[in-house]
From Swiss-Prot:
One of its GO terms (cellular component) is cytosol. Belongs to the XseB family. GO terms for molecular function: exodeoxyribonuclease VII activity. InterPro entries: Exonuc_VII_S, Exonuc_VII_ssu_sf. The keyword Transmembrane helix does not apply. It catalyses: Exonucleolytic cleavage in either 5'- to 3'- or 3'- to 5'-direction to yield nucleoside 5'-phosphates. Heterooligomer composed of large and small subunits. One of its GO terms (biological process) is DNA catabolic process. It is an enzyme of class 3 (hydrolase). It comes from Ruthia magnifica subsp. Calyptogena magnifica. This is Exodeoxyribonuclease 7 small subunit. Its EC number is 3.1.11.6. The gene is xseB. NCBIfam families: PRK00977.1-4, xseB. It is found in: Cytoplasm.
């Protein structure tokens, strides 16, 4: 069984990748490897956010919650 993606750990890993790449100490090959891992992690994080958004939408729709977003203008 596949392990469930941990969003918070994904963000931590992305931050590490960015810091490592920003250091400028990587070879081109290693930079491409880190970049590839970063893109994959970004997709996983975005997927987790989309899933959470869908769950929130379904929960609020079930309760006949109005679809106003008071935080939208922040």
């Amino acid at each position: 069984m596949a392990k469930k993606f941990d969003f918070n750990q994904g963000l931590i890993d992305l931050e590490k990748i960015v810091k490592t790449m920003e250091s400028g100490d990587l070879s081109l090959e290693n930079s491409l490897d880190y970049f590839s891992k970063g893109v994959a992690l970004t997709k996983l994080c975005q997927s987790a956010l989309n899933e959470a958004e869908q769950k929130i939408f379904m929960l609020t729709e079930q309760d006949n919650y109005t679809n106003e977003n008071p935080l939208k203008d922040l």
